[in-house]
Design a protein with these regions (language model features):
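Short loop/turn motifs at secondary-structure junctions and domain boundaries
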Residues: 48-54
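Acyl-donor (CoA/ACP) binding surface of acyl/acetyltransferases
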Residues: 1-30, 57, 61-170
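Conserved GNAT-fold acetyl-CoA-binding loop/helix
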Residues: 27-47
Length: 170
């Protein structure tokens, strides 16, 4: 099902044909489980289609060639927070810098605020070294709130500090 359409990309519910590409990226469909097994991905897909009240995953598809260029997820960031955290990844270096990610973040932000009345806050957590994602957050209307110390996960040796960005319902 198409969730939202922009000028470059559209967001869709995850489809069976998206699972193989998603499997190449550990945390692209779930932040709590590194999903790289096609068999495990299919079990979850068959159970709930990667869509629940508390979390969901979407495909980012290029309008130009109908190709899967990335995936996004949203999930409850905490039991007392009235909103979600959003994560995204473009699967191929080739697709970066084309505006796909920023449009996808804007589309999912608008979708969640429109479709989930109890959602009052969306947040992005971005590791300190990731300048392109920090610029993307600001370009999409997210405000920097501060630093989460030792919250990053990209290094196995030492967790890194992260910036937290949020956008609240108008």
């Amino acid at each position: 099902m198409i969730l939202a359409t922009g000028s470059r990309v559209r967001l869709l519910n995850i489809r069976v044909k998206d699972l193989e590409a998603a499997a190449a990226h550990k945390f692209t469909l779930s932040i709590t489980e590194p999903l790289t097994s096609l068999k495990r991905l299919r079990v979850i897909f068959d159970r709930n289609g990667f869509w629940t009240e508390d979390a969901g995953a979407v495909a980012i598809e290029s309008l130009e060639d109908k190709r899967l260029v990335g995936t996004m997820q949203f999930y409850r960031s905490g039991p007392c927070i009235h909103g979600y955290e959003i994560g995204s990844i473009l699967h191929d270096e080739y697709d970066r810098g084309k505006g796909y990610a920023s449009e996808a973040v804007r589309l999912l932000t608008d979708y969640l605020f429109a479709q989930r009345p109890g959602c009052h806050r969306l947040q992005l957590i971005i590791e300190e070294w990731n300048d392109p994602s920090a610029r993307l957050a600001e370009a999409c209307g997210y405000a920097s709130e501060g630093i989460l110390r030792k919250a990053g996960y990209s290094s196995e040796d030492e967790p890194s500090d992260c910036f937290i960005y949020s956008r609240v319902r108008d």
